[in-house]
Regions:
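Glycine-rich flexible loops
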Residues: 1-198
Length: 198
């Protein structure tokens, strides 16, 4: 089991990777993990660029918002993360991106056009109903879209990927972006065929 120090560094490393891969831009997006036995969430701070973020900048807080350790404010989306941890007992990491292709401005489900969608994500990528950013409702609205899935899009907002740990959540965010990109390209030249089963 990783220490809190190691998890903080992993959040920084994966956030920087997401920044370089285009899943984050500026200070948008956020990542967290949850240590259930300690009731402790580690989350990226708000308004800090990922290319200058350090492990000590990661904020430790309870799901009720009580900051346990940290000199910066937690991500403005901490309530969304908390709602997902409360509603999904198998989830220990949440990754919220503003990726370029997996957008949700059209409020549509992204069909499972790649095998990865079935194998790793659980099927098509549903779109959660809109809620005001920074509110718990963003996370609550995501729960139905996450049922049986490892990620969803958030209407007019971005992507939410989850996993048992940070590595899984990050990988699922990459798969969501890949499926969305291939679907968008395929849709521009014809009608993509959705996979219903392996």
């Amino acid at each position: 089991m990783k220490t809190i120090t190691e998890l903080r560094q992993e959040i920084v490393d994966r956030s920087l990777q997401a920044f370089h891969e285009g899943l984050f831009s500026g200070t948008s997006g956020n990542m967290s993990c949850y240590l259930r036995e300690e009731d402790l969430m580690l989350i990226t701070p708000t308004s800090v660029r990922y290319d200058v973020m350090r492990a000590e900048d990661i904020v430790a807080l309870r799901l009720d918002g009580t900051v346990v350790e940290g000199h910066l404010k937690p991500s403005s989306e901490w309530r969304m993360h908390a709602a997902v941890y409360e509603g999904c007992p198998d989830v220990n990491a949440v990754f919220h991106t503003h990726s370029p292709t997996a957008f949700a401005v059209n409020h549509q489900t992204i069909p499972a056009v790649l095998i990865e969608a079935l194998v790793f994500l659980g099927g098509d990528i549903r779109c959660a109903d809109y809620a005001t950013p920074g509110t718990k409702e963003v996370g609550l609205n995501a729960l139905p879209a996450l049922e049986g899935r490892k990620g969803c899009t958030l209407a007019n907002h971005g992507v939410l990927a989850v996993g048992g740990d940070l590595a899984q959540a990050y990988l699922n965010a990459e798969y969501i972006e890949d499926v969305a990109r291939i679907y968008a390209i395929a849709h521009s030249v014809g009608t993509p065929v959705e996979l219903k089963s392996l």
